[in-house]
A protein has these predicted regions:
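Internal catalytic-core helix/loop-beta-alpha segment
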Residues: 248-289
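C-terminal helical cap(s) of enzyme catalytic domains, especially alpha/beta-barrels
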Residues: 83-93, 115, 127-146, 181-191, ...
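Glycine-rich phosphate-binding active-site loops on the catalytic face of alpha/beta enzymes
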Residues: 11-32, 70-80, 117-137, 164-177, ...
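Hydrophobic faces of well-ordered beta-strands that scaffold small-molecule active sites
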Residues: 1-2, 22-24, 48-50, 69-71, ...
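Catalytic cores of alpha/beta
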Residues: 6-17, 54-64, 104-123, 151-162, ...
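Active-site/ligand-binding-proximal alpha/beta "capping" segment
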Residues: 63-144, 272-275, 279, 283-301, ...
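Active-site beta-loop-alpha junctions enriched in small/polar residues
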Residues: 4-5, 27, 53-55, 74-76, ...
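N-terminal active-site wall of soluble small-molecule enzyme domains
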Residues: 1-49, 57-60, 86-89, 168-240
Length: 357
């Protein structure tokens, strides 16, 4: 029960309505009031999240025997957010206590930033304001990652269950992962929890790629020879597609052109970039050190990603990852290995930028 609890009747009501835990804020309670309310909660077997906002309150919480410390990043006077507060106050907390970061938890990058010193996160409107809370939770915890080359409803369901947000449907007859429009419709109907991306090497007729509930079209055509021609291709796709469908551009980072330079040039023309090795789907990676910093937060990193190198890929700090052949059964293009998916996303979930100290 997350409320400004100041009276024990609120705890009785919380338990009556099925609460497992309550929030006690030291900013509004004296030590005596906290102890009395904590005793009532403990009598019901409720966990207590003790909220603190500074060093003094953290010391009070420990003195009062709090085991779950909630660090509120929000200044309750001016509502500003200080995300560094968790790191400062977690350093005062013993290792056997649980630290929960509160307020300002808006994306996976924030979760990874705070994960080195926080054991959990308290998130409210960032999730409840979304039309699909399950998908929003996946994006918050794992990031906007994509599993491409889905060939069946089972593969899509495994991708969503593992933590993916996007599912890639390849509409390209030359690809071993090509799907028909009928198969695509079956996949989308069976797993509506993914946002689907149509992937194609075509340079015209983008409207033909439209299927129900499509989130984006990923242009995987070869390099068009110049930045101007690339922009014309992207503009042509936008002209054919509804405003609700994003336009992504795959950029080969190992081609004849400078992939990093091209990605930078196209940054403002696309909704997202996909940085890949060659034509994609080859199971090979490229030199990630050549990715310009300026494009990373609008790019999905692709090319040879698998459970063994996911942590290294996350360290590149792109917006998200694009997995394909590295989470398939060997020699079976399009048949996703649910075990490999789970291992990859387990690494994504637990990845953070620093150890708690």
């Amino acid at each position: 029960c997350k409320d400004f609890i100041i009276d024990e009747v609120q705890i009785h009501a919380a338990r009556y309505f099925g609460a497992d835990a309550i929030l006690l804020m030291l900013s509004v309670l004296s030590d005596e009031e906290y102890a009395a309310l904590a005793a009532v909660a403990e009598g019901y077997g409720l966990d207590i999240l003790t909220e603190v906002i500074d060093e003094e309150e953290t010391e009070r919480a420990l003195r009062l025997g709090a085991k779950i410390i909630g660090v509120n990043h929000r200044n309750l006077h001016d509502l500003s957010i200080d995300l560094d507060r968790s790191a400062r106050l977690a350093a005062l907390v013993p290792d056997d206590a649980v630290v929960v970061s509160e307020s300002g938890i808006r994306d996976a990058a924030t979760v990874r930033r705070l994960g080195g010193h926080s054991n959990g996160f308290l998130v409210g409107s960032q999730l409840t304001s979304q039309p699909d809370i399950d998908r929003a939770a996946r994006e918050l915890v794992y990031g906007p990652n994509k599993v491409c080359g889905l060939g069946s409803a089972n593969a899509a369901q495994a991708a969503a269950a593992a933590g993916a947000v996007y599912g890639g449907l390849i509409f390209e007859e030359a690809s071993p992962r090509n799907v028909s429009r009928e198969t695509a419709a079956e996949i989308i109907a069976a797993e509506p929890g993914l946002q689907y991306v149509a992937v194609s090497r075509r340079t015209s007729g983008f409207r033909e790629l439209l299927v129900d509930d499509l989130a984006a079209v990923q242009i995987h055509a070869p390099y068009q020879g110049s930045v101007e021609a690339e922009r014309a291709l992207i503009a042509a796709a936008r002209a054919e597609l509804p405003d609700t469908v994003e336009v992504w551009r795959a950029v080969s980072m190992t081609g004849l052109q400078d992939g990093g330079e091209l990605a930078t040039d196209l940054l403002e023309d696309v909704d997202k970039l996909v940085l890949d090795a060659g034509d994609g789907g080859t199971g090979t990676s490229f030199d990630w050190s050549g990715i310009p910093d300026v494009v990373k937060q609008k790019s999905l990193l692709a090319g040879g990603l698998n459970p063994a190198n996911i942590a290294d890929a996350l360290a590149v700090d792109c917006l998200g990852l694009d997995l394909n052949s590295g989470v398939e059964y060997p020699g079976q293009p399009g048949r996703k290995d649910s075990g490999a998916l789970r291992r990859a996303f387990a690494t994504i979930r637990t990845y953070h930028h620093q150890d708690r100290s």
